[in-house]
Amino acid sequence: YEHDHFFSGCLVGPNVFAGDRFVATRRLKDLRSTDTNDMTPDPLRGSYLAVYWWLENTDEETNRWNVENVNKLHAQGRMYAERDHVHTLLYDMKWNVQREPTGCTIDLALDHGYPGLVVVAGDVAEGHTHAEVEAWFKDTWLPDAMSKPWGPELVGSGTVIPLADDAPADVVRAAAGPNRFLQLHFLDHDSAEGWEEGYARIGAAMEASGLAHHVWTAPWQQTNFGTDDYTDQLR
């Protein structure tokens, strides 16, 4: 299913120009934040993550193709109903920051082959704005994090694009609303390195800022395309 769907689910569609796939082995799942949230009620669920980039200003066309295509794949029996489908959502990339000015840019991130990835989700606190949260990350959290060995090389942050009403029934309708943001932190090292010093504390830092509420933080690693590597390490 993973080998088929990585391409047939999105990558062959219009406007989609990059994709990458990540896995969470048990050692990484054990590092996930465990607070109750609307994304992952069970912290041990969700072993694979596929991420795709598509061209800006093509959301309606691309989303329409995705819905019709996945419904077709369902009809062909190619959606592997036995899996746990934990979270699918579209995000509009609003900003990004890279550690090195001449380093990898966000449009090339999924082709770069970063060995580690951390997903960070949060909600803007009542009375505050996405712009304030962006400024806090850019001015406070990221400069410090990017100076540390555990820190990211590149970060992209997006806001929610609502799913189509006729999206497949097995796609979980997350409670995420307009205050939700989701960030992808790309690492040039194992995402478990320095976890307790670094990403284990990002939720508390977000809450302490008064600008955002922490939803979920989770580390991932690259899959090895064309193999079943890591399937024996998921639980």
Where are the language model's segments positioned?
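Macromolecular interaction modules
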Residues: 2-235
